[in-house]
Curated annotation (Swiss-Prot):
Name of the gene: hcp
Lineage of source species: Bacteria, Pseudomonadati, Bacteroidota, Bacteroidia, Bacteroidales
Protein name: Hydroxylamine reductase
InterPro entries on file: HCP/CODH, Hydroxylam_reduct, Prismane-like_a/b-sand, Prismane-like_sf, Prismane_a-bundle
Cross-referenced Gene3D superfamilies: 1.20.1270.20, 3.40.50.2030
Cofactor info, note text: Binds 1 [4Fe-4S] cluster.
Amino acid sequence: MEKKMFCYQCQETAGNKGCILKGVCGKDFSTANLMDLLVFNLKGIAIIMTSMRRAGVKADYRKADKAIMESLFATITNANFDYSSIAKRVEKTFALKAELYSLAFTQGIELPENEAVTMQGKPEEYDRLALSVGILRETDEDVRSLKELTIYGLKGLAAYAEHADRLGYVDEEINAFTERALHDVTMGLLSAEELTALVLETGSFGVKVMALLDKANTETYGNPEITEVNIGVGSRPGILISGHDLKDMEMLLEQTEGTGIDVYTHGEMLPANYYPKFKKYNHFFGNYGNAWWKQREEFETFNGPILFTTNCIVPPKANASYKDRVFTTNATGYPGFKYIESDQHGRKDFSEIIALAKTCQPPTEIESGTIIGGFAHHQVLSIADKVVEAVSSGAIRKFVVMSGCDGRQSGRNYYTEFAEALPSDTVILTSGCAKFRYNKLQLGDIGGIPRVLDAGQCNDSYSLAVIALKLKEVMGLDDINKLPIVYNIAWYEQKAVIVLLALLSLGVKNIHVGPTLPAFLSPNVAKVLIENFGIAGIGTVEEDIRTLIA
Protein backbone atom coordinates (compact mmCIF):
# COMPACT_ATOMS: atom_id res chain seq x y z
CA MET A 1 0.00 0.00 0.00
CA GLU A 2 1.29 3.44 -0.93
CA LYS A 3 2.44 5.53 2.02
CA LYS A 4 1.07 9.06 1.81
CA MET A 5 2.53 9.87 5.23
CA PHE A 6 4.17 8.15 8.15
CA CYS A 7 3.47 8.95 11.78
CA TYR A 8 3.61 6.71 14.83
CA GLN A 9 4.02 9.18 17.68
CA CYS A 10 0.75 8.47 19.54
CA GLN A 11 -0.73 5.42 21.25
CA GLU A 12 -3.62 5.12 18.81
CA THR A 13 -1.47 4.94 15.67
CA ALA A 14 -2.93 2.57 13.07
CA GLY A 15 -2.40 -1.09 13.97
CA ASN A 16 0.16 0.04 16.54
CA LYS A 17 2.53 0.32 13.56
CA GLY A 18 2.00 3.74 12.00
CA CYS A 19 -0.48 5.92 10.13
CA ILE A 20 0.25 5.93 6.38
CA LEU A 21 -2.88 7.34 4.70
CA LYS A 22 -4.44 9.61 7.31
CA GLY A 23 -3.86 10.05 11.00
CA VAL A 24 -6.12 8.09 13.33
CA CYS A 25 -6.24 11.42 15.16
CA GLY A 26 -7.98 12.91 12.10
CA LYS A 27 -5.02 14.79 10.65
CA ASP A 28 -4.79 14.65 6.85
CA PHE A 29 -1.59 13.39 5.26
CA SER A 30 -0.57 16.76 3.81
CA THR A 31 -0.64 18.42 7.25
CA ALA A 32 1.19 15.49 8.84
CA ASN A 33 3.91 15.71 6.18
CA LEU A 34 4.16 19.46 6.63
CA MET A 35 4.82 18.87 10.33
CA ASP A 36 7.76 16.68 9.32
CA LEU A 37 9.13 19.62 7.33
CA LEU A 38 8.57 21.94 10.29
CA VAL A 39 10.50 19.64 12.63
CA PHE A 40 13.25 19.31 10.01
CA ASN A 41 13.57 23.10 9.93
CA LEU A 42 13.75 23.16 13.72
CA LYS A 43 16.61 20.66 13.55
CA GLY A 44 18.46 22.99 11.19
CA ILE A 45 17.90 25.97 13.47
CA ALA A 46 19.08 23.88 16.42
CA ILE A 47 22.29 22.92 14.61
CA ILE A 48 23.07 26.58 13.92
CA MET A 49 22.16 27.63 17.46
CA THR A 50 24.28 24.88 19.02
CA SER A 51 27.22 25.78 16.79
CA MET A 52 26.97 29.44 17.84
CA ARG A 53 26.63 28.58 21.52
CA ARG A 54 29.69 26.34 21.35
CA ALA A 55 31.62 29.14 19.64
CA GLY A 56 30.68 31.50 22.46
CA VAL A 57 28.72 33.88 20.24
CA LYS A 58 26.90 36.45 22.36
CA ALA A 59 23.51 37.03 20.76
CA ASP A 60 19.82 37.29 21.57
CA TYR A 61 18.72 33.67 21.28
CA ARG A 62 15.21 34.37 22.55
CA LYS A 63 13.53 34.44 19.13
CA ALA A 64 14.95 31.09 18.10
CA ASP A 65 14.33 29.50 21.50
CA LYS A 66 10.65 30.46 21.37
CA ALA A 67 10.27 29.34 17.76
CA ILE A 68 11.63 25.90 18.58
CA MET A 69 9.49 25.39 21.69
CA GLU A 70 6.27 26.73 20.19
CA SER A 71 6.64 24.82 16.93
CA LEU A 72 7.54 21.55 18.62
CA PHE A 73 4.41 22.03 20.73
CA ALA A 74 2.31 22.58 17.59
CA THR A 75 3.27 19.11 16.33
CA ILE A 76 2.04 17.28 19.44
CA THR A 77 -0.85 14.89 18.86
CA ASN A 78 -4.25 16.62 18.60
CA ALA A 79 -2.82 20.13 18.93
CA ASN A 80 -3.01 21.49 15.40
CA PHE A 81 -4.84 20.15 12.35
CA ASP A 82 -4.66 23.35 10.30
CA TYR A 83 -2.43 23.10 7.21
CA SER A 84 -2.31 26.87 6.76
CA SER A 85 -1.25 27.39 10.39
CA ILE A 86 1.60 24.87 10.07
CA ALA A 87 2.59 26.35 6.68
CA LYS A 88 3.00 29.76 8.32
CA ARG A 89 5.29 28.21 10.92
CA VAL A 90 7.31 26.51 8.17
CA GLU A 91 7.66 29.84 6.37
CA LYS A 92 8.79 31.59 9.55
CA THR A 93 11.31 28.88 10.39
CA PHE A 94 12.81 29.00 6.89
CA ALA A 95 13.25 32.76 7.33
CA LEU A 96 14.67 32.38 10.84
CA LYS A 97 17.09 29.71 9.66
CA ALA A 98 18.35 32.00 6.89
CA GLU A 99 18.75 34.84 9.39
CA LEU A 100 20.73 32.66 11.80
CA TYR A 101 22.82 31.21 8.98
CA SER A 102 23.80 34.73 7.96
CA LEU A 103 24.63 35.66 11.56
CA ALA A 104 26.81 32.59 11.97
CA PHE A 105 28.61 33.42 8.71
CA THR A 106 29.37 36.97 9.86
CA GLN A 107 30.77 35.53 13.10
CA GLY A 108 33.11 33.29 11.13
CA ILE A 109 31.44 30.08 12.27
CA GLU A 110 31.75 27.14 9.90
CA LEU A 111 28.42 25.33 9.90
CA PRO A 112 27.95 21.64 9.05
CA GLU A 113 26.89 20.89 5.48
CA ASN A 114 23.69 19.26 6.67
CA GLU A 115 20.53 19.49 4.59
CA ALA A 116 18.56 20.55 7.66
CA VAL A 117 20.80 23.63 7.78
CA THR A 118 20.94 24.45 4.09
CA MET A 119 17.43 23.61 2.88
CA GLN A 120 15.24 26.55 1.87
CA GLY A 121 11.88 26.48 0.12
CA LYS A 122 8.91 28.44 -1.13
CA PRO A 123 5.29 27.68 -0.12
CA GLU A 124 4.57 25.99 -3.43
CA GLU A 125 7.49 23.62 -2.75
CA TYR A 126 6.56 22.64 0.80
CA ASP A 127 4.60 19.49 -0.03
CA ARG A 128 7.40 18.15 -2.24
CA LEU A 129 10.13 18.99 0.27
CA ALA A 130 8.15 17.44 3.12
CA LEU A 131 8.16 14.04 1.44
CA SER A 132 11.95 13.88 1.64
CA VAL A 133 12.39 14.67 5.35
CA GLY A 134 9.99 12.33 7.15
CA ILE A 135 10.66 9.85 9.92
CA LEU A 136 11.56 7.01 7.54
CA ARG A 137 14.48 9.08 6.24
CA GLU A 138 16.45 7.23 8.93
CA THR A 139 16.66 3.67 7.59
CA ASP A 140 18.13 1.94 10.66
CA GLU A 141 15.13 0.85 12.71
CA ASP A 142 16.88 0.97 16.08
CA VAL A 143 18.59 4.30 15.47
CA ARG A 144 15.29 5.70 14.23
CA SER A 145 13.55 4.43 17.36
CA LEU A 146 16.05 6.10 19.69
CA LYS A 147 15.99 9.35 17.73
CA GLU A 148 12.19 9.52 17.68
CA LEU A 149 11.98 8.61 21.37
CA THR A 150 14.22 11.61 22.03
CA ILE A 151 12.25 13.90 19.72
CA TYR A 152 8.89 12.91 21.22
CA GLY A 153 10.33 13.54 24.66
CA LEU A 154 11.47 16.97 23.45
CA LYS A 155 7.96 17.71 22.18
CA GLY A 156 6.56 17.05 25.64
CA LEU A 157 9.35 19.08 27.21
CA ALA A 158 8.61 21.95 24.82
CA ALA A 159 4.95 21.99 25.82
CA TYR A 160 5.85 22.42 29.48
CA ALA A 161 8.53 25.00 28.72
CA GLU A 162 6.04 27.02 26.68
CA HIS A 163 3.53 27.05 29.56
CA ALA A 164 6.21 28.23 31.97
CA ASP A 165 7.41 30.85 29.50
CA ARG A 166 3.92 32.35 29.27
CA LEU A 167 4.13 32.99 33.01
CA GLY A 168 7.56 34.58 32.68
CA TYR A 169 9.66 31.59 33.73
CA VAL A 170 12.47 30.60 31.37
CA ASP A 171 15.48 28.33 31.89
CA GLU A 172 18.23 28.94 29.33
CA GLU A 173 19.81 25.59 30.18
CA ILE A 174 16.63 23.80 29.09
CA ASN A 175 16.54 25.76 25.84
CA ALA A 176 20.19 25.02 25.09
CA PHE A 177 19.72 21.31 25.82
CA THR A 178 16.69 21.10 23.53
CA GLU A 179 18.74 22.57 20.70
CA ARG A 180 21.72 20.34 21.42
CA ALA A 181 19.53 17.24 21.47
CA LEU A 182 17.96 18.17 18.12
CA HIS A 183 21.48 18.82 16.82
CA ASP A 184 22.70 15.43 18.01
CA VAL A 185 19.84 13.36 16.55
CA THR A 186 20.22 15.14 13.21
CA MET A 187 23.98 15.08 12.72
CA GLY A 188 24.10 11.28 12.85
CA LEU A 189 27.35 11.11 14.80
CA LEU A 190 26.12 9.29 17.93
CA SER A 191 26.34 5.54 18.50
CA ALA A 192 23.33 3.57 19.73
CA GLU A 193 24.78 3.70 23.25
CA GLU A 194 25.22 7.47 23.04
CA LEU A 195 21.68 7.88 21.71
CA THR A 196 20.39 5.81 24.64
CA ALA A 197 22.26 8.13 27.01
CA LEU A 198 20.67 11.10 25.22
CA VAL A 199 17.23 9.59 25.81
CA LEU A 200 17.91 9.47 29.55
CA GLU A 201 19.39 12.96 29.52
CA THR A 202 16.17 14.13 27.88
CA GLY A 203 14.36 12.59 30.84
CA SER A 204 16.53 14.47 33.33
CA PHE A 205 15.68 17.72 31.56
CA GLY A 206 12.06 16.62 31.70
CA VAL A 207 12.37 16.72 35.49
CA LYS A 208 13.91 20.20 35.24
CA VAL A 209 11.16 21.57 33.01
CA MET A 210 8.39 20.11 35.16
CA ALA A 211 10.03 21.66 38.21
CA LEU A 212 10.17 24.98 36.36
CA LEU A 213 6.49 24.80 35.43
CA ASP A 214 5.54 23.77 38.96
CA LYS A 215 7.42 26.83 40.25
CA ALA A 216 5.73 29.06 37.65
CA ASN A 217 2.24 27.80 38.43
CA THR A 218 2.53 27.79 42.23
CA GLU A 219 4.31 31.14 42.56
CA THR A 220 1.73 32.73 40.26
CA TYR A 221 -1.48 31.06 41.42
CA GLY A 222 -0.64 29.54 44.82
CA ASN A 223 -0.14 25.94 45.86
CA PRO A 224 -3.00 23.63 44.84
CA GLU A 225 -5.15 22.72 47.82
CA ILE A 226 -7.66 20.00 48.56
CA THR A 227 -10.80 21.06 46.72
CA GLU A 228 -14.27 19.71 46.06
CA VAL A 229 -15.09 20.56 42.45
CA ASN A 230 -18.67 21.02 41.31
CA ILE A 231 -19.45 18.82 38.29
CA GLY A 232 -23.01 20.05 37.87
CA VAL A 233 -24.25 23.14 36.04
CA GLY A 234 -25.68 26.55 36.85
CA SER A 235 -28.52 28.55 35.35
CA ARG A 236 -26.37 31.05 33.42
CA PRO A 237 -24.62 30.73 30.04
CA GLY A 238 -21.08 29.42 30.22
CA ILE A 239 -17.72 29.28 28.50
CA LEU A 240 -15.86 25.96 28.51
CA ILE A 241 -12.06 26.15 28.65
CA SER A 242 -10.00 23.10 27.73
CA GLY A 243 -6.29 22.34 27.60
CA HIS A 244 -3.52 23.18 30.05
CA ASP A 245 -2.68 26.89 29.83
CA LEU A 246 -3.32 28.57 33.19
CA LYS A 247 -2.42 32.03 31.85
CA ASP A 248 -5.34 31.81 29.45
CA MET A 249 -7.51 30.63 32.33
CA GLU A 250 -6.55 33.70 34.34
CA MET A 251 -7.27 36.11 31.49
CA LEU A 252 -10.61 34.48 30.73
CA LEU A 253 -11.72 34.70 34.37
CA GLU A 254 -10.65 38.35 34.54
CA GLN A 255 -12.52 39.30 31.38
CA THR A 256 -15.72 37.38 32.21
CA GLU A 257 -16.06 38.77 35.73
CA GLY A 258 -19.32 40.68 36.08
CA THR A 259 -20.61 39.68 32.64
CA GLY A 260 -23.21 37.15 33.77
CA ILE A 261 -21.18 34.33 32.22
CA ASP A 262 -19.92 31.30 34.14
CA VAL A 263 -16.62 29.58 33.35
CA TYR A 264 -16.25 25.80 33.38
CA THR A 265 -13.16 23.65 32.90
CA HIS A 266 -12.96 20.60 30.66
CA GLY A 267 -10.48 17.74 30.49
CA GLU A 268 -6.96 18.65 31.56
CA MET A 269 -8.05 22.11 32.74
CA LEU A 270 -9.91 20.50 35.68
CA PRO A 271 -6.96 21.11 38.08
CA ALA A 272 -7.34 24.88 37.62
CA ASN A 273 -10.09 24.46 40.20
CA TYR A 274 -7.44 23.59 42.81
CA TYR A 275 -5.46 26.87 42.64
CA PRO A 276 -6.24 29.48 45.34
CA LYS A 277 -5.98 32.49 43.02
CA PHE A 278 -8.75 31.21 40.78
CA LYS A 279 -11.11 30.50 43.68
CA LYS A 280 -11.74 34.21 44.23
CA TYR A 281 -13.82 34.31 41.05
CA ASN A 282 -17.42 33.53 41.98
CA HIS A 283 -18.33 32.86 38.36
CA PHE A 284 -15.77 30.02 38.13
CA PHE A 285 -18.44 27.35 38.39
CA GLY A 286 -16.61 24.01 38.21
CA ASN A 287 -15.85 21.26 35.71
CA TYR A 288 -18.04 20.05 32.87
CA GLY A 289 -17.56 16.62 31.39
CA ASN A 290 -14.72 14.19 31.25
CA ALA A 291 -11.57 13.40 29.27
CA TRP A 292 -10.78 14.97 25.89
CA TRP A 293 -12.08 12.14 23.72
CA LYS A 294 -15.68 12.61 24.89
CA GLN A 295 -15.84 16.17 23.59
CA ARG A 296 -18.00 15.42 20.54
CA GLU A 297 -20.92 14.61 22.83
CA GLU A 298 -20.10 16.97 25.71
CA PHE A 299 -19.55 20.05 23.54
CA GLU A 300 -23.01 19.52 22.04
CA THR A 301 -24.68 19.58 25.46
CA PHE A 302 -22.57 22.40 26.87
CA ASN A 303 -24.37 24.82 24.53
CA GLY A 304 -21.83 27.64 24.91
CA PRO A 305 -18.44 28.57 23.41
CA ILE A 306 -15.37 26.37 23.87
CA LEU A 307 -11.78 27.64 24.11
CA PHE A 308 -8.88 25.29 23.35
CA THR A 309 -5.70 26.57 24.98
CA THR A 310 -3.66 23.46 24.03
CA ASN A 311 -4.31 19.96 22.76
CA CYS A 312 -6.48 17.83 22.68
CA ILE A 313 -8.81 18.61 19.77
CA VAL A 314 -11.03 15.92 18.25
CA PRO A 315 -12.24 16.77 14.73
CA PRO A 316 -15.97 17.48 15.01
CA LYS A 317 -18.55 15.50 13.07
CA ALA A 318 -19.78 17.10 9.87
CA ASN A 319 -23.16 17.86 11.45
CA ALA A 320 -21.80 19.06 14.81
CA SER A 321 -23.81 22.00 16.12
CA TYR A 322 -20.87 23.38 18.12
CA LYS A 323 -18.38 23.89 15.25
CA ASP A 324 -19.04 27.64 15.10
CA ARG A 325 -18.58 27.96 18.86
CA VAL A 326 -15.00 26.66 19.08
CA PHE A 327 -12.00 28.96 19.46
CA THR A 328 -8.30 28.04 19.50
CA THR A 329 -5.19 29.85 20.66
CA ASN A 330 -1.44 29.31 21.25
CA ALA A 331 -0.14 26.25 19.35
CA THR A 332 -3.59 24.88 18.54
CA GLY A 333 -5.53 25.11 15.33
CA TYR A 334 -8.28 23.47 13.28
CA PRO A 335 -9.70 24.49 9.88
CA GLY A 336 -12.78 26.63 10.43
CA PHE A 337 -12.19 27.25 14.14
CA LYS A 338 -11.55 30.88 15.07
CA TYR A 339 -8.06 31.66 16.35
CA ILE A 340 -7.35 34.11 19.18
CA GLU A 341 -4.02 35.93 18.81
CA SER A 342 -2.06 37.43 21.67
CA ASP A 343 -0.64 40.94 21.55
CA GLN A 344 3.05 41.80 21.96
CA HIS A 345 2.65 41.57 25.74
CA GLY A 346 0.99 38.15 25.65
CA ARG A 347 -2.48 39.53 26.40
CA LYS A 348 -5.57 38.20 24.63
CA ASP A 349 -8.94 39.72 23.93
CA PHE A 350 -11.70 37.22 24.63
CA SER A 351 -14.54 39.68 23.97
CA GLU A 352 -15.78 37.74 20.92
CA ILE A 353 -16.10 34.56 22.98
CA ILE A 354 -17.88 36.44 25.77
CA ALA A 355 -20.30 38.11 23.36
CA LEU A 356 -21.13 34.74 21.81
CA ALA A 357 -21.66 33.17 25.24
CA LYS A 358 -24.29 35.78 26.05
CA THR A 359 -26.40 34.52 23.13
CA CYS A 360 -26.21 30.86 24.21
CA GLN A 361 -28.33 28.69 26.45
CA PRO A 362 -26.92 27.50 29.80
CA PRO A 363 -25.18 24.11 29.80
CA THR A 364 -27.31 20.98 29.88
CA GLU A 365 -26.64 18.93 32.99
CA ILE A 366 -24.92 15.61 32.27
CA GLU A 367 -23.93 14.79 35.85
CA SER A 368 -24.07 16.31 39.32
CA GLY A 369 -22.25 16.32 42.61
CA THR A 370 -18.57 16.94 43.32
CA ILE A 371 -15.17 15.34 42.86
CA ILE A 372 -12.10 15.95 45.00
CA GLY A 373 -8.57 16.87 43.95
CA GLY A 374 -5.67 19.16 44.72
CA PHE A 375 -3.19 16.63 46.10
CA ALA A 376 -0.02 18.15 44.67
CA HIS A 377 3.27 17.78 46.54
CA HIS A 378 2.86 20.80 48.85
CA GLN A 379 -0.53 19.57 50.03
CA VAL A 380 0.48 15.93 50.44
CA LEU A 381 3.77 16.71 52.17
CA SER A 382 1.88 18.86 54.67
CA ILE A 383 0.37 15.59 55.92
CA ALA A 384 3.54 13.52 55.39
CA ASP A 385 3.53 12.33 59.01
CA LYS A 386 0.01 11.00 58.59
CA VAL A 387 0.95 9.25 55.35
CA VAL A 388 4.09 7.67 56.82
CA GLU A 389 2.14 6.52 59.87
CA ALA A 390 -0.47 4.92 57.61
CA VAL A 391 2.28 3.08 55.73
CA SER A 392 4.13 2.05 58.90
CA SER A 393 0.97 0.74 60.53
CA GLY A 394 0.00 -1.24 57.45
CA ALA A 395 -3.14 0.79 56.85
CA ILE A 396 -1.71 1.68 53.44
CA ARG A 397 -0.03 -1.29 51.79
CA LYS A 398 0.81 0.26 48.43
CA PHE A 399 0.57 3.48 46.48
CA VAL A 400 -0.30 2.90 42.84
CA VAL A 401 0.79 5.62 40.42
CA MET A 402 -1.80 5.69 37.62
CA SER A 403 -0.84 8.97 35.98
CA GLY A 404 -1.02 9.60 32.28
CA CYS A 405 -3.46 10.03 29.45
CA ASP A 406 -6.88 8.76 28.55
CA GLY A 407 -7.92 7.75 25.05
CA ARG A 408 -10.67 6.32 22.89
CA GLN A 409 -9.71 2.65 22.68
CA SER A 410 -12.18 0.32 24.36
CA GLY A 411 -9.31 -1.51 26.04
CA ARG A 412 -8.79 1.49 28.29
CA ASN A 413 -11.71 0.22 30.37
CA TYR A 414 -8.90 -1.83 31.90
CA TYR A 415 -7.89 1.18 34.00
CA THR A 416 -11.36 1.57 35.49
CA GLU A 417 -11.53 -2.14 36.25
CA PHE A 418 -8.00 -2.12 37.68
CA ALA A 419 -8.86 0.77 40.01
CA GLU A 420 -12.03 -1.00 41.15
CA ALA A 421 -10.14 -4.25 41.75
CA LEU A 422 -7.37 -2.73 43.86
CA PRO A 423 -7.43 -3.88 47.50
CA SER A 424 -8.93 -1.42 49.96
CA ASP A 425 -5.53 -0.80 51.58
CA THR A 426 -4.08 0.79 48.43
CA VAL A 427 -4.09 4.44 47.34
CA ILE A 428 -4.03 5.68 43.74
CA LEU A 429 -1.72 8.60 42.94
CA THR A 430 -2.77 10.23 39.68
CA SER A 431 -2.33 13.20 37.38
CA GLY A 432 -3.28 13.89 33.78
CA CYS A 433 -6.54 12.94 32.11
CA ALA A 434 -6.09 9.25 32.94
CA LYS A 435 -7.86 10.19 36.17
CA PHE A 436 -11.23 10.36 34.44
CA ARG A 437 -11.28 6.56 34.25
CA TYR A 438 -11.64 6.33 38.04
CA ASN A 439 -11.90 9.73 39.76
CA LYS A 440 -15.67 9.45 40.05
CA LEU A 441 -15.65 5.96 41.54
CA GLN A 442 -16.63 5.70 45.18
CA LEU A 443 -13.43 4.11 46.46
CA GLY A 444 -13.57 5.59 49.96
CA ASP A 445 -10.61 6.61 52.10
CA ILE A 446 -8.02 5.23 54.50
CA GLY A 447 -8.00 7.06 57.81
CA GLY A 448 -9.24 10.21 56.10
CA ILE A 449 -6.83 9.91 53.15
CA PRO A 450 -8.87 9.54 49.93
CA ARG A 451 -7.97 6.46 47.91
CA VAL A 452 -7.62 8.57 44.76
CA LEU A 453 -5.18 11.47 45.16
CA ASP A 454 -5.23 13.71 42.09
CA ALA A 455 -2.12 15.89 41.83
CA GLY A 456 -3.33 17.78 38.76
CA GLN A 457 -2.39 18.02 35.09
CA CYS A 458 0.00 15.67 33.31
CA ASN A 459 2.94 17.95 34.16
CA ASP A 460 2.00 17.55 37.82
CA SER A 461 3.49 14.07 37.61
CA TYR A 462 6.39 16.09 38.97
CA SER A 463 4.46 16.31 42.25
CA LEU A 464 4.29 12.54 42.44
CA ALA A 465 8.06 12.33 41.95
CA VAL A 466 8.61 14.93 44.69
CA ILE A 467 6.31 12.99 47.02
CA ALA A 468 8.15 9.74 46.28
CA LEU A 469 11.58 11.28 46.87
CA LYS A 470 10.41 12.86 50.13
CA LEU A 471 8.94 9.57 51.36
CA LYS A 472 12.24 7.87 50.47
CA GLU A 473 14.05 10.42 52.64
CA VAL A 474 11.60 10.27 55.54
CA MET A 475 11.55 6.46 55.53
CA GLY A 476 15.35 6.30 55.41
CA LEU A 477 15.53 4.27 52.19
CA ASP A 478 18.52 4.23 49.84
CA ASP A 479 16.57 3.37 46.68
CA ILE A 480 13.37 4.91 45.33
CA ASN A 481 12.32 1.45 44.17
CA LYS A 482 12.16 0.21 47.78
CA LEU A 483 9.17 2.47 48.44
CA PRO A 484 5.72 0.85 48.60
CA ILE A 485 4.93 2.50 45.25
CA VAL A 486 4.14 0.74 41.97
CA TYR A 487 3.52 2.26 38.56
CA ASN A 488 0.74 1.43 36.10
CA ILE A 489 0.75 4.32 33.65
CA ALA A 490 -1.52 4.98 30.69
CA TRP A 491 0.03 6.91 27.82
CA TYR A 492 -1.32 8.59 24.72
CA GLU A 493 0.88 11.41 23.43
CA GLN A 494 4.27 13.03 23.76
CA LYS A 495 3.83 14.72 27.13
CA ALA A 496 3.40 11.23 28.56
CA VAL A 497 6.68 10.31 26.86
CA ILE A 498 8.62 13.02 28.69
CA VAL A 499 6.97 12.01 31.97
CA LEU A 500 8.06 8.40 31.41
CA LEU A 501 11.60 9.46 30.52
CA ALA A 502 11.69 11.71 33.59
CA LEU A 503 10.79 8.78 35.83
CA LEU A 504 13.46 6.61 34.21
CA SER A 505 16.05 9.35 34.74
CA LEU A 506 15.17 9.36 38.45
CA GLY A 507 15.92 5.65 38.61
CA VAL A 508 12.33 4.40 38.81
CA LYS A 509 12.03 0.83 37.57
CA ASN A 510 9.33 -1.72 36.79
CA ILE A 511 6.91 0.77 35.25
CA HIS A 512 3.94 -0.82 33.48
CA VAL A 513 2.90 1.15 30.39
CA GLY A 514 -0.34 0.68 28.47
CA PRO A 515 -2.69 0.04 26.93
CA THR A 516 0.02 -0.80 24.36
CA LEU A 517 3.74 -0.18 24.25
CA PRO A 518 4.69 2.62 21.84
CA ALA A 519 4.94 1.68 18.16
CA PHE A 520 8.07 3.79 17.89
CA LEU A 521 9.98 1.40 20.16
CA SER A 522 11.79 -1.08 17.92
CA PRO A 523 12.05 -4.63 19.29
CA ASN A 524 15.70 -4.05 20.22
CA VAL A 525 15.06 -0.70 21.92
CA ALA A 526 12.09 -2.18 23.77
CA LYS A 527 14.37 -5.03 24.88
CA VAL A 528 16.89 -2.54 26.31
CA LEU A 529 14.13 -0.76 28.27
CA ILE A 530 12.76 -4.06 29.53
CA GLU A 531 16.14 -5.46 30.58
CA ASN A 532 17.58 -2.28 32.10
CA PHE A 533 14.49 -0.64 33.57
CA GLY A 534 11.91 -3.39 33.90
CA ILE A 535 9.49 -1.62 31.56
CA ALA A 536 6.46 -3.83 30.92
CA GLY A 537 3.12 -3.72 29.20
CA ILE A 538 -0.18 -4.57 30.81
CA GLY A 539 -1.95 -7.91 31.01
CA THR A 540 -5.33 -8.69 32.50
CA VAL A 541 -6.54 -6.86 35.58
CA GLU A 542 -6.20 -10.02 37.65
CA GLU A 543 -2.66 -10.73 36.46
CA ASP A 544 -1.49 -7.17 37.07
CA ILE A 545 -3.04 -6.97 40.53
CA ARG A 546 -1.09 -10.12 41.44
CA THR A 547 2.13 -8.73 39.93
CA LEU A 548 1.97 -5.22 41.32
CA ILE A 549 0.22 -5.69 44.67
CA ALA A 550 2.28 -8.49 46.15
